[in-house]
Structure formats: structure tokens, C-alpha cells
Amino acid sequence: MVARTGSTNIMVRKLIDLLSKQKKPLWKRVAEELQKPSRQRPYINIYKINKYTKPNDVVVVPGKVLGIGNLDHPVTVVALSFSKSAKEKIEKSGGKVISLYKALEEVKDFKNVRLMKG
């Protein structure tokens, strides 16, 4: 049996280390999700973000955001990666797209933050 080595992406490994050192439980939970194999990370479509959020919410996705569906209110989406169409639809609705790498500096208010895992 092969020993589990974790992510081979150096940037993801550094991000996991950085997130796990944070004091907020949300970032520790995101670090746990990122430690899973890449095929077990969540892939969230735009229509789910639209369904489960209110205007001006912050959504954290420890995986990839895909562009199926429409978004009819502004939402800030933080994720490991985005498809091109998902970025366009989020920005078209007045929302913001933030990578997990930059989210530690930009997300300060945790009142309207939702973690979405599919």
C-alpha cells in the first residue's frame, strides 16, 4: 500500500499550512478540506451559490467554482479556483471573485460567511 503524501501542488501545501495557523475556525475547516485528495474537493456550480445565499454574502468554497446556472444577486465568492464562465457570471451580477490565497487579507467580517462543500 502506498503512503499518503498529500497534495503535490506546492502552493496548495503552503496555503494549507497558512490556513491551519489561523485563529478563526472557518480557516481551519477550509484547511482540512484542502488536505483531501483533489478528486474529493467540492465543485460548486453558480446555481447552488444563487440558491443558498442572500445579497452581499461571502461564500467560501474549498475547491472549484463552475459556471452552470445564473446568479441574480451580488455575492463575494472565495475559492481555490474558478472556471472562466463562473468568474464572468459572478462579476456580471456585481459580485467579487477572490482566490483563497488573497482571502486571508481581504475577508475580515465573518457575519455573512458561508462554507459550501457541495
From Swiss-Prot:
PROSITE patterns to which the protein is assigned, alphabetical: RIBOSOMAL_L18E (PS01106)
Keywords linked to the UniProt accession: Ribonucleoprotein, Ribosomal protein
Family membership noted in the UniProt record: Belongs to the eukaryotic ribosomal protein eL18 family.
GO cellular component terms, A-Z: ribonucleoprotein complex; ribosome
Any GO molecular function: structural constituent of ribosome
Organism the protein comes from: Sulfurisphaera tokodaii (strain DSM 16993 / JCM 10545 / NBRC 100140 / 7) (Sulfolobus tokodaii)
Gene Ontology process terms (BP): translation
UniProt key word Ribonucleoprotein: yes
Cross-referenced NCBIfam families: PRK04005.1 (NF003079)
InterPro entries named in the record: Ribosomal_eL18/eL18-A/B/_CS (IPR021132), Ribosomal_eL18_arc (IPR022947), Ribosomal_uL15/eL18 (IPR021131), Ribosomal_uL15/eL18_sf (IPR036227), Ribosomal_uL15_CS (IPR001196)
Origin organism lineage: Archaea, Thermoproteota, Thermoprotei, Sulfolobales, Sulfolobaceae
Gene: rpl18e
Pfam families cross-referenced by the UniProt entry: Ribosomal_L27A (PF00828)
Chain coiled-coil ranges: none
Protein name: Large ribosomal subunit protein eL18
Annotated Gene3D superfamilies: 3.100.10.10
